[in-house]
C-alpha cells in the first residue's frame, strides 16, 4: 500500500505578505461539505455541488408531464469578448441578492475575458457588470492564446459561498492566475486579489469551495503552470499546491470533494512513476489538513501505458454518491469505460482493482478526439431507490442499450443503473438519447434530464492539411446548439429548442435552479428557459 504520502508545497503569495495579512492559525482537517443542506433552489458551483453529481434536488414545477411546454423565457446579449473557443462558463444562480435597489435571484455569467455579469434570473435584466483588472506582474499576452488547447481565457467556473455563510461572496479565478472575491450586490472586489496560480493562462477548471478552502486543478501545462491540485485557504490566506506536477487534470467541473473532505480528480496521459507520485491516467484522492495536501489513495487502470500511448486520457470529473452504506465515485474518460470506486479504497490493495471496471461502452474506434466520455457526469436516485449514472458520450456505442431513440452516430446522453453484484457492483445499460452533436454534461431535476447538444466541432487533427485545427477552423465548423429535456427513466425527448439558438458553446454546460434552465453561447447571448 502507498500509505499517506505528502506531496505538496505551501506558500503565501508575496502581495499578501506586503499587506500584512499573514498569520492566523493553521486550518484543521477539512471535512464534510454540506450534504445537500440548501433549502433554496440555487446553483453555486460546477455540477451544482461539491460532490459534482449534477442533481438539482430543489425542483418541483417542471415534470416529465409538462416539460414539453418549456419555452424561452428570455435572452440577453452581453458585451463579452471571446477567447479562442471560450465564451461563458457554467452559470451560477444565487437567491436573495440585494442589488440595484431590490432583492433578486441572480444569474452569474463569467466571460472568457475576465468579465462577470449579474442578471435578474426572472427577466434577464443586467444588474451589474464588471471587468476584472489584470493583477499579475507578468503582462498580458496579445492575442487569444495557442490554438484551442491553451487559450488566454478565464476557464474555471466560479463558485459562490454556501447559503448558510455569514457573508456570501462570489469567487472568480481570472486568467492572470489571481483569485477574486466579489461582492454579489455590486460586482466590486471585496478583498485584494490573491495569487492562486504561478503564472497567467494556466487553464484551471471548476472551483470547489468546502469549509472555506477553494480547490481547483489545472490541465495541459498551459502558460507554464504546473498541472496540480491547488488549495487556497480563505481563513489563513495560504496557498497549497500538490507535488509533484501531474499529467493534465482537466475534468471540466474541476475536483470533486467527498463527505469527509477528501478531494478527487482524474489525470490525463503522461509519465508514470507511482513511487514519486507521478500518477498519469489515474484517479487520485488527496486530503487537506493544516495547509498540507497529502496523497491518500489512487487507482490506475492496468492498461494505463496503452491509454497514454493512444491519448485516451481519464479526463472527466468524477461524481460522488452514497450507495448501500458506502460512498462511491464514478469516473470515465476518452477510452469509453466507466470506473466505480469505493472512496475508502479506490483501487484496492494493488491500486489496480476498483469495484468495477466496466466493459467498453463507447469509442470502439479508439478515437482520441471526438468519442468516449468528456467533461463530467451526473448521478441521481429515483423514487424506487435505483441509482442512476448519466454521462455524455461521443460516437457510436459499443454495447447494446435496451431503450434507444433512433441512430446516434454523434453520441448523446447514456443512462446506466448501478446494481449490486455480490461484493462488487455492475452498471446496466438503460437508455440512450437521440443523436446529439457534442453533448455537454447533463443535469437531472425532478425526473427530467436537461442537456445541451453544444454543436461544437471537436476534431483536433487536420488529416487533410496536417497539424491541428485552429480555434478559428473549429469555430467555423461548429453547428448551433440545442437544449433538450429528456424523461429521466426512458431517455425520451420531451422538449427540444429546435433552431432557436443560433450559436454553439464549448465546454460550458447549463445550470438548473428555480425551475429554470440557464446557459450562454459563443455569440455572447445568454438564455433562460422554463414554464410560462
Model-predicted regions and their roles:
Residues 38-73, 92, 414:
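Blade/loop signatures of beta-propeller domains
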Residues 60-85, 98-105, 114-152, 160-201, ...:
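Extracytoplasmic/lumenal domain signature
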Residues 16-28:
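Bacterial N-terminal signal peptides
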Residues 1-19:
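Bacterial N-terminal signal peptides that target proteins for export
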Residues 36-39, 532:
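Low-complexity, Pro/Thr/Ser/Gly/Ala-rich linker/spacer regions in secreted
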Residues 89-95, 107-109:
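General structural concept
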Residues 27-37:
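Signal peptide processing junction and immediate N-terminal pro/mature segment
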Amino acid at each position: 500500500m502507498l500509505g499517506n504520502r505528502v506531496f505538496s508545497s505551501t506558500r503565501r503569495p508575496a502581495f499578501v505578505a506586503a499587506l500584512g495579512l499573514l498569520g492566523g492559525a493553521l486550518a484543521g482537517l477539512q471535512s464534510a461539505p454540506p450534504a445537500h443542506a440548501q433549502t433554496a433552489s440555487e446553483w453555486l458551483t460546477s455540477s451544482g455541488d461539491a460532490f459534482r453529481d449534477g442533481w438539482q434536488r430543489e425542483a418541483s414545477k417542471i415534470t416529465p408531464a409538462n416539460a414539453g411546454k418549456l419555452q424561452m423565457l428570455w435572452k440577453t446579449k452581453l458585451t463579452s469578448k471571446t477567447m479562442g473557443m471560450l465564451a461563458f462558463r457554467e452559470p451560477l444562480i444565487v437567491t436573495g441578492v440585494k442589488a440595484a435597489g431590490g432583492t433578486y435571484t441572480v444569474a452569474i455569467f463569467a466571460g472568457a475575458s475576465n468579465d462577470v455579469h449579474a442578471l435578474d434570473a426572472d427577466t434577464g435584466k443586467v444588474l451589474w457588470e464588471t471587468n476584472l483588472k489584470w493583477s499579475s506582474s507578468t503582462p498580458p499576452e496579445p492575442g487569444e492564446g495557442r490554438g484551442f488547447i491553451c487559450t488566454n481565457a478565464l476557464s474555471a467556473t466560479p463558485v459562490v459561498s454556501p447559503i448558510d455563510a455569514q457573508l456570501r461572496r462570489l469567487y472568480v479565478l481570472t486568467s492572470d492566475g489571481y483569485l477574486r472575491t466579489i461582492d454579489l450586490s455590486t460586482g466590486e472586489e471585496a478583498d485584494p486579489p490573491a495569487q492562486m496560480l504561478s503564472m497567467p493562462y494556466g487553464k484551471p477548471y471548476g472551483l470547489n469551495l468546502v469549509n472555506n478552502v477553494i480547490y481547483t486543478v489545472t490541465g495541459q501545462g498551459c502558460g507554464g503552470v504546473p498541472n496540480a491540485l491547488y488549495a487556497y485557504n480563505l481563513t489563513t490566506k495560504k496557498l497549497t499546491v500538490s507535488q509533484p506536477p501531474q499529467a493534465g487534470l482537466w475534468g471540466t467541473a474541476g475536483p470533486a470533494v467527498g463527505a469527509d473532505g477528501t478531494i478527487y480528480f482524474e489525470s490525463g496521459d503522461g509519465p508514470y512513476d507511482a513511487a514519486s507520485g507521478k500518477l498519469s491516467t489515474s484517479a487520485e484522492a488527496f486530503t487537506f489538513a493544516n495547509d498540507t495536501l497529502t496523497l491518500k489513495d489512487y487507482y490506475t487502470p492496468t492498461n494505463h501505458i496503452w491509454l497514454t500511448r493512444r491519448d485516451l486520457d481519464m479526463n472527466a470529473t468524477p461524481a460522488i454518491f452514497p450507495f448501500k452504506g458506502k460512498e462511491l465515485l464514478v469516473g470515465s474518460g476518452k477510452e469509453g469505460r466507466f470506473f466505480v470506486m469505493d472512496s475508502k479504497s479506490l483501487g484496492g490493495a494493488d491500486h489496480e482493482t476498483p469495484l468495477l471496471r466496466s466493459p467498453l461502452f463507447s469509442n470502439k474506434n479508439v478515437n482520441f478526439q471526438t468519442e468516449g466520455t468528456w467533461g463530467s457526469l451526473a448521478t441521481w436516485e429515483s423514487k424506487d431507490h435505483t441509482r442512476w449514472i448519466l454521462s455524455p458520450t461521443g460516437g457510436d456505442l459499443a454495447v447494446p442499450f435496451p431503450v434507444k431513440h433512433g441512430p446516434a452516430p454523434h453520441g448523446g446522453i447514456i443512462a446506466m443503473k448501478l446494481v449490486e453484484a455480490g461484493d462488487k457492483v455492475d452498471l446496466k445499460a438503460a437508455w440512450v438519447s437521440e443523436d446529439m452533436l457534442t453533448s455537454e454534461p447533463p443535469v437531472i431535476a425532478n425526473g427530467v434530464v436537461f442537456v445541451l447538444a453544444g454543436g461544437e466541432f471537436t476534431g483536433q487533427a487536420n488529416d487533410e492539411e496536417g497539424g491541428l485545427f485552429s480555434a478559428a477552423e473549429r469555430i467555423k465548423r461548429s453547428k448551433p446548439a440545442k437544449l433538450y429535456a429528456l424523461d429521466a427513466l426512458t431517455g425520451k425527448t420531451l422538449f427540444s429548442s429546435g433552431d432557436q439558438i443560433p450559436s454553439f458553446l464549448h465546454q460550458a454546460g447549463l445550470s438548473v435552479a428555480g425551475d429554470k434552465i440557464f446557459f450562454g453561447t459563443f455569440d455572447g447571448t445568454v438564455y433562460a428557459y422554463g414554464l410560462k
